[in-house]
């Protein structure tokens, strides 16, 4: 855990210390009965001693369409590492360094102070902001940030990223996006929705809707495209959707299973699962030429599925029952050599590689309950991250510090998040229905 002020400098080292037949069936069952709803953050577990921080209402913030300082406070609170002071308890409201009375903040037990001022400009807004160490009475960070007329939430998330990195040594991920699938319910014709939102669930944007199930959304690394599975052709087919132009293109529609798309690091290829030749196998599709490369070759009783690229793009990590039960394997694309990676437990599936390429997260079954687990690839050491049940679809934040996953809460599907060290947890519950299949975006290039 990262605890309190004295531990923040060590944050970096401590925090960074598709579908098979069975998974497809599970996801389709769980997808039933979902309803549209906004996402609301609910922190379920934070650091034992979160660092007290005050984000003072920014000068010029009044009358703006977004409360920038409140968004920053919510971002930092959601990390679980910080506890923001309420403006109602503040003794003063400085917006520039000369106005800071450090005594006011020591009285409140505040370790760090964030202040700023927002002014309108010809092109939008300009914020000048700073981070201050209360005990040492010194400035730690000072920047000027400009955004367009609709960029106030982006401004807030960027400031949160800067503050988080300054205090933990880890790049923030508050400015990133998420994808997820939701179901409006059987009374709505086009009930299945692919949604894009900010990492905090705000600014939902409908990408695509269909009367047939949608599965496995996957971001391209340049954030301009999404690949996903749609059943609109009466069988699973893989589509790509351009987020800039809105254009959709069907990439596969082979007989049998077409599923689990995963973009290569350079976005030129998709790893995917096809059963056109019999049993489900891993293939690579060259998007420009449409050439197919078969990666795995097994007999008819074997299911190879849920591919995920290694960080260097030289291998594929995937789920297979070739050993009898679902386990995670890695295949080298140059050699074709297959290596088993998981040995603990009788069910490990849906692998996702961490950004540093050193570990992976997965769905792990223990005592008949599905949890999210982390494993060091080299040593094989595994730890269970979640205490919820029927957990699935893990997706890792681009800084490797947190992951999103789908789970059950109060008899409905929700999205939840957990830190890689399992010390921080929060939930993004739906107010009305269920949401599934999260995909956390990479960083913007």
Swiss-Prot record:
SUPFAM superfamilies: TolB, N-terminal domain (SSF52964), Tricorn protease N-terminal domain (SSF69304). The keyword Signal applies. Residues 1-37 form the signal peptide. It comes from the Bacteria. Keywords: Cell cycle, Cell division, Periplasm, Signal. One of its GO terms (cellular component) is periplasmic space. GO terms for biological process: cell division; protein import. The Tol-Pal system is composed of five core proteins: the inner membrane proteins TolA, TolQ and TolR, the periplasmic protein TolB and the outer membrane protein Pal. They form a network linking the inner and outer membranes and the peptidoglycan layer. Part of the Tol-Pal system, which plays a role in outer membrane invagination during cell division and is important for maintaining outer membrane integrity. HAMAP family: TolB. This is Tol-Pal system protein TolB. It comes from Saccharophagus degradans (strain 2-40 / ATCC 43961 / DSM 17024). The lineage of its organism: Bacteria, Pseudomonadati, Pseudomonadota, Gammaproteobacteria, Cellvibrionales. The gene is tolB.
